Amino acid sequence: MRITNVRFIKGRSKMEKLKKRWNKVTVLLLTFGIVFGLFGAMPVQAQDGNASGSTIFDVKIVHTNDIHARVEEDDYNQVIGMDRLSGIAQTFTEGADGSLMLDSGDTFHGQPIATLVKGESVAKLMKACGYDAMTTGNHDWSYGKERLKELGGIANVKILSGNIKNADGTSFFDTDELVKEITKNGKTLKIGVFGVSDPEMKNKTTPSNVEGLDFQDAVAYAKREAATLKAEGCDVVIALSHTLDPKM
């Protein structure tokens, strides 16, 4: 699990950024005219007016990846479990102006507690934790493409892998993005989230699980989607990705 505290100052005309490292760090992609990396907690200052009119947005992000259905606490293997995760997330985000809970895939498969019910147990726990969005890892396709869609519904989470298309070019999942607006002192901070999955994962699952799907170039899609969200007025763009290539 990774937790990130981000403070956004909205109301002036130049961008500044200050870095503060946490013990646990995460990497997110933010778009403010450019795309840059966010490491740990970083106050970001977006300016478009006078300083006296600035509004600070306290946004807290909880991020997980590669859970592999390890939902039960296991101190020996340093697994905190979903129960503790939920409590930590609730405590961490309390009092924030806004929060997001995100996952980068390989979530629904990997332990008997999940495989015996085709991922439903994990999906229900994700719903209880309050996840907002996730992207897919190769193991999430293990129960088949339609079951993966069903699990997203059970979890009440948006599955974002917009570079995965049907044969007719339409997106396989119901939506390509999550947009969250946070309003404070008459100003609104708009956060856009999208997801990409490595095309190589099509070759890392049983062919029937992804039959008829086109896994398009992840980098090209990410560039287009970041530009789209920026054009739609997003102050912040977060990319969720699951890749098999460490150089991607």
Predicted regions located by residue number:
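Generic detection of intrinsically disordered/low-complexity segments and helix-coil linkers/edges
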Residues: 2, 30-33, 102, 135
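Bacterial Sec-dependent N-terminal signal peptides
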Residues: 2-29
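Low-complexity, acidic Ser/Thr/Pro-rich repeat tracts that form intrinsically disordered stalk/linker regions
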Residues: 4-13, 43-59
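Compositionally biased, intrinsically disordered low-complexity segments
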Residues: 6-12, 30, 37-39, 74-76, ...
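Sec-dependent N-terminal signal peptides of Gram-positive bacterial secreted proteins and lipoproteins
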Residues: 21-44
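Acidic, metal/ion-coordinating pockets
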Residues: 47-248
